[in-house]
Amino acid sequence: MSHKELWNFVRIKKNTSKLLFIHTPKCGGTYTNNILYDLKIINKNLPVNRKNHIPANGNEKEITFTIIRNPVDRFESLLNFRLGMDIFEDWPQHLHYVYNDKNITLNEIVDKMSDDEILSFTPYKSLIYWTKNVDIIITIEQLEELLNFFDYFYDHNIYKKENVSIKSRGVFNNEVKNRISKLYHYDVLLYDKIKNSTFFHNCT
């Protein structure tokens, strides 16, 4: 069964073509939100608080969808993003000093984090958490195809990526990549499963 056949199955099962976006953090959501806003597609975050991330509960009448990305790239993006902001409450207390020393690399920072600290960022959480009860899971590369399938059309050339993290501390080396992959093992399995196809699990 092709991914379009799966999408059509969801549409028939829920008897609607209305979409509801579930914003998984650090997966291109800001860029996507700009497109969806212009298309008047509902976002689970809006209109209560555009910055909040609200998971699906499985009772939505609309077709819920979310976007995920490579879990290692996602975590690297999170850290680079955080290091460009003020210190968040969930940032490890013993690593506050790295904000004052730009020479400390991303790999050195991760090396000093415990596994629990790596897994405790919020509202970041795991891809498994954010995709629970979601009807359709895609990658950012599949966004335009999905929207077109449900009769939403836009010119992707007028939209630019936003909140792109500046990699001033470098990128992950292979050792750190392997560690993050193991810690987010199930996220990696999920991402690999839908990378070249679409996976849904709420309308079965």
Locations of regions flagged by a protein language model:
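Membrane-interface amphipathic segments in extracytoplasmic regions
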Residues: M1-T204
